[in-house]
Amino acid sequence: MESSASTGAGDVPKGMQVCVVTETFSPEVNGVAMTLGHLIMGLLKRKHLVTLIRPRQHAYDRPGCCTKPNVVLVPGLPVPGYKTIRFGLPMRRKLQKIWNINRPDVIYVATQGPLGWAAVVEATRGNIPVISGFHTNFHRYAQHYHVT
């Protein structure tokens, strides 16, 4: 993994390649999407290269917050009771192919759905550092959306 630290006088630090995997993102309006929008904007501002992997959300092909991340759309299915959001399918082979071609320095998994699970499995298999955040208590929401 390349360091983002400067190697000498006058050198410009090299940004990291960061991959963000999520089930939801702008222009959807929810806490996870808004938080990730700020995270990605901050990473881009600091000259990191960002790849965003998310399910296609009907007509939404580009994130509403920014145009700089490389966006990879994957198939998804509607969340029962929450038809405006689609969860990503566990696209393990596609993730493996993407990361073999352009290996990220780190992967951030923002949601723990099937796509997020597949990302953790493939990152671990590929020896790529992976981190995750807890944004939503889906176990609690599952009762509300009648999927338990």
PLM region descriptions:
Residues V32, F87-L89, Q112:
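A conditional alpha-helix N-cap/helix-loop micro-motif detector
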